[in-house]
Amino acid sequence: MSHVRKQIRDYLLSTITGLSTTGAKAFASRVYPLDSGKLPAVIVYTLSEDSVESAFSKRREQDRQLDAIVEGYVRALNTFDDTLDQIASEVEAAILADTTLGGLVKNVELTGTDTDYAGDSEQPVGTVRLTFRIQYRTVTGSPNSAI
């Protein structure tokens, strides 16, 4: 079994694949750039995670808070702001429809949304970045199983 972080990314990717605006163009990597033929698209990845030993448990457990990012990308046309808002709306509704991610985590909350525009390539690109704070728990030393 994989680390709970990977399980969370996989769950999020499954949740955002097939949205109305981006369809099957959902990816789990930010390493490779998206060419204009793959836009509009969304990607999901995780950033930082804070872990603390739980003070309220008989066994050693860790309470974890993970920041997961979903980024939407569109070609920057006249209506790119509207399209980015539509992607953000679809992502937010899909992920927050089940704030336990099928029982994998304790809670998910949206903590921020940012938009940006990059006009330095052949095809300008607009982006929206949604940050989700995900709370989950593991037994200390067993990071592959959420409890």
Where are these regions (language model features)?
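Charged, amphipathic alpha-helical segments and their flanking helix caps
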Residues: 1-35, 46-147
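A short glycine-rich, His/Asp/Glu-containing loop-to-beta-strand
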Residues: 40-44
